[in-house]
Amino acid sequence: MKIAIDAMGGDHAPKAVVLGAMKAIKEYSDLHITLVGKEEEIRQYLTSEERITILHTDEKIESTDEPVRAVRRKKQASMVLAAQQVKDGVADACISAGSTGALMAAGLFVVGRMEGIERPALSPTMPTVDGEGFVMLDVGANVDAKPIHLYQYAVMGSVYAEKVRGIKNPRVGLLNVGTEDGKGNELSKQVFAMLKDAPINFVGNVESRDLLQGVADVVVCDGFTGNVALKSLEGTALALFSMLKEQLMSSFTSKLAAAVLKPKLMVLKDKMDYSEYGGAALFGLKAPVIKAHGSSNDQSIFSAIRQTREMVAKEVIPTISSVMEKEPLQ
């Protein structure tokens, strides 16, 4: 199995990418990795070249670049070359912690959209209080959506949750303003009716306040709604941890309490740590394309590689294609 990785994407590249890749190579004997980027910088952190190949390029996509224009003009950019490796059949999948918009453009223009899928979806795995997490799609690939798009998101998310996350008969929920049937705008109502007849375990509408309680294994929404919900959850979690830290450091007695509680707090932090869940998959493309978090450390990169390897090994893309062929809905 071969995975191409944009070694220059992310806040801590190439160090975090190289260290994460070496960790994955040690863990998985069937894995070969191509690191795409500036060879001189990559070699500063590469202590072993076992099953690791470097594809040198001096060009990369900057966070300030306009995504679509950058992908079209910077043909030798590390992210574009990683996607090209997939298109050419040299690699089975690709990963980048670089610009989300640019990776979506590279996925569409270079890797290509899966036949029958109208719009790809960006899908991270979000943490829950029980540590199991849930798949959420779309969180920003498309801010506007039609009912058919959300129907396809639900099917793709269900296949992923079962194949990669090992959830038997995953529960699929539609993010809405209430749990009752008939709630929401016209889009929500149409999608609800379609999902009731879909080849999935549809559990109905779910509210954003219940997401972290693990009310569903897959949560479906349009990209605008998903992005707002995602950032609200992230912001709330950061604010709560910040307030908790402030209170625990406010006095001598509270500092003593913090010392006692530290092991439990670390368990809680690990449960809510996105780095353990991998990256956000771009569903709807011809091959696995994974967007790692921009601030990914080596553990985050390792988790993204593990996730990508599972997608390839469990044949997620062929399975989605097969399901969509059996259940055509235009």
From Swiss-Prot:
HAMAP family: PlsX (MF_00019). GO terms for cellular component: cytoplasm. Gene3D superfamilies: Isopropylmalate Dehydrogenase. It holds the Pfam family FA_synthesis. Pathway: Lipid metabolism; phospholipid metabolism. Catalyzes the reversible formation of acyl-phosphate (acyl-PO(4)) from acyl-[acyl-carrier-protein] (acyl-ACP). This enzyme utilizes acyl-ACP as fatty acyl donor, but not acyl-CoA. Homodimer. Probably interacts with PlsY. Its main location: cytoplasm. The lineage of its organism: Bacteria, Bacillati, Bacillota, Bacilli, Bacillales. GO terms for biological process: fatty acid biosynthetic process; phospholipid biosynthetic process. Keywords: Cytoplasm, Lipid biosynthesis, Lipid metabolism, Phospholipid biosynthesis, Phospholipid metabolism, Transferase. One of its GO terms (molecular function) is phosphate:acyl-[acyl carrier protein] acyltransferase activity. This is Phosphate acyltransferase.
